Swiss-Prot record:
The keyword Ribonucleoprotein applies. This is Large ribosomal subunit protein uL16. It holds the Pfam family Ribosomal_L16. The gene is rplP. GO terms for biological process: translation. One of its GO terms (cellular component) is cytosolic large ribosomal subunit. Binds 23S rRNA and is also seen to make contacts with the A and possibly P site tRNAs.
Amino acid sequence: MLQPARTKYRKMMKGRMRGKAYRGSDLNQGEYGLQATECGWLTARQIEAARVAITRYVKRGGKLWIRVFPDKPITKKPAETRMGTGKGNVEYYVAVVKPGRVLYELAGVDDESAKKAFHLAAHKLPVATKLVKRGSTL
């Protein structure tokens, strides 16, 4: 599972997701990319599930880059606990995603394989996505 090795502070405020992503919205390494079209939180498990779906489909055919990292800790209180007595313990980590953010990049495969692989991965993610190609959208 992806998570930070160490953090300056253990717990973080909830925050807001406004606007669109300007950084991380272009393809860096790959020929194809999976781009978010809405905002949301991607958990480390969801990122990993989508990665497995892509790599299983393309097998050894292509190279995959993960462009998001879950660095925001999400806390949770135990069940049947009274309110108060501070913030809960860290349960898992999420990556904050805004519209336009490229989540995954893929190279070394043809159009059809990239389309199918990203379609399988999109089903594992809680945000709406679209497929982008270097130079144009598919």
